């Protein structure tokens, strides 16, 4: 019997990268997966990939920065499968590179709006459902940049620090309701977003990788494995934790 047989899992930002890997990993362990993404094409591709391996999956389009869409997403997920065991709030963007004094209000608002407000909105409506059913697990995607500073990416760094703060607060607020809340904090992972940070410059990439003790990029599947562990009964005594999946970056 797989760890997640019959479990219902919601994954945002599931159309590509880490979100897609999380969806595939849950599907491979027996979950019914609600694939959520703002991009219809990539979201439907992920849902199709899950059904191709014999999993139950449904795609829901949602902009996580808009409450009515998030509320509808959670409602439709529960209407489809009856309940919500796990939620992985993974949708996010890199935003535009900017130092604090150079950042535009538009860049700040967009990055915070998706990466931080979006996670809060998802948590809000997921928790309301989990309170009704008496249990649940949430894993939010933060970043290694949520644990340290990073020059030139102030909106992104602020948003990811905020995700960890939300995670810890919610973990304390809802522990007695049998709801666990954790975060996963990847460093540079082999996804399209990595290009946003390196600009495709091999020298920049080499420098970043040199800061990671394992001297390579992580894979989406490695992050997904950490997420599944946090959602599993194996991590039943873990809540309020920010788990770095960083190749040793933060060991320095």
Give residue ranges: language-model regions.
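C-terminal helical subdomain
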Residues: 183-186, 203-238, 247
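Residue(s) in the substrate-gating loop at a strand-loop-helix junction
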Residues: 143
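Canonical Rossmann dinucleotide-binding motif of NAD(H)/NADP(H)-dependent dehydrogenases/reductases
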Residues: 2-34
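Short, small/polar-rich loop/turn modules that mediate ligand/substrate recognition or access, typified
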Residues: 175, 180, 238-240
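Short C-terminal tail/terminal secondary-structure segment
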Residues: 94-97, 148, 228, 239-252
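Substrate-binding pocket helix/loop in short-chain dehydrogenase/reductase
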Residues: 98-100, 104-112, 208
């Amino acid at each position: 019997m797989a760890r997640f047989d019959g479990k219902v899992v919601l994954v945002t930002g599931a159309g590509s990268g880490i979100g897609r890997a999380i969806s595939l990993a849950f599907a491979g362990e027996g979950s019914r997966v609600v694939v959520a993404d703002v991009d219809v094409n990539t979201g439907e591709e992920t849902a199709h990939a899950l059904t191709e391996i014999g999993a139950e999956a449904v795609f829901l389009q949602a902009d996580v920065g808009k409450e009515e869409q998030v509320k509808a997403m959670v409602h439709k997920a529960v209407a489809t499968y009856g309940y919500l065991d796990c939620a992985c709030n993974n949708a996010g963007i890199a935003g535009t590179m900017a130092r604090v004094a150079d950042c535009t209000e538009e860049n700040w608002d967009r990055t915070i709006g998706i990466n931080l407000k979006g996670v809060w909105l998802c948590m809000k409506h997921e928790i309301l459902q989990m309170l009704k059913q008496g249990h649940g697990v949430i894993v939010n995607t933060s970043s290694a940049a949520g644990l340290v500073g990073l020059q030139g990416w102030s909106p992104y760094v602020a948003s990811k620090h905020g995700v960890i703060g939300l995670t810890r607060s919610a973990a304390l607020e809802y522990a007695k309701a049998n709801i666990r809340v954790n975060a996963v904090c990847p460093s540079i992972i082999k996804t399209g977003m990595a290009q946003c940070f390196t600009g495709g410059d091999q020298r920049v990439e080499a420098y970043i990788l040199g800061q990671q003790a394992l001297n390579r990029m992580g894979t989406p599947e490695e992050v997904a494995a950490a997420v599944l562990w946090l959602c599993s009964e194996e991590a039943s005594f873990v809540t309020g934790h920010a788990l770095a999946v960083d190749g040793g970056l933060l060991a320095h």
